């Protein structure tokens, strides 16, 4: 069964799901932090870790240059034994992160924004069993293509768009999937009886139509 990680930068969400047995970990990224108005990374991380118990938590480096990425990665890793350092598969110039993995390989790493077959093949020889590779399956499927995977380590299905992606992640052999709070709220619909769901939908339409004159 695929493990579910909460994908959020909201301390309220993190606190809400910290003890939820369905949630096995937490991920964040710079875009999520920007959306939440986070400006002090260290203080935010301390707040997250104080609420998340011993569940794995991923924090991403902010730098684009490899030297500064390495420095930030080591600092982020020092925040706690359950911390995973997210490294983008390339910098903004398209230069691969792979050469940096030799220096940082002993850390808990989460290689993120992976989308191409070539990227997964390149990682195949470098990643270690304790690493995570985040394949942006949802974004790949937005382009009308199916995602790939990388088996030497834990593989994470990122950017899920719907509950069905949980089923696909299980079928494709992924270890982890990240879900936003709105998708977690929909997990109760998994395997719901469709006849009952149909009846509930008809009842909803009937109820909502009562105030409309014809």
Tell where the protein language model's regions lie, with residue ranges.
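Conserved N-terminal beta1-alpha1 strand-loop-helix module at the mouth
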Residues: 1-56, 64-66, 70
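Short beta-strand/loop segments at the ligand-binding rim of alpha/beta enzyme cores
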Residues: 1-5, 54-57, 80-84, 100-111, ...
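Catalytic cores of alpha/beta
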Residues: 12-20, 68-72, 117-126, 161-176
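Glycine-enriched alpha-helix->loop->beta-strand junction motifs that scaffold or abut catalytic
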Residues: 21-25, 53, 79-83, 102-110, ...
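Conserved, mostly hydrophobic/aromatic
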Residues: 29, 85, 123, 169, ...
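Glycine-rich phosphate-binding active-site loops on the catalytic face of alpha/beta enzymes
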Residues: 30-33, 113-115, 129-143, 173-194
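Active-site-adjacent beta->alpha loops and helix N-cap segments on the catalytic face
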Residues: 35-46, 65-71, 89-105, 115-125, ...
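C-terminal alpha-helical cap/extension of soluble enzyme domains
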Residues: 150-214
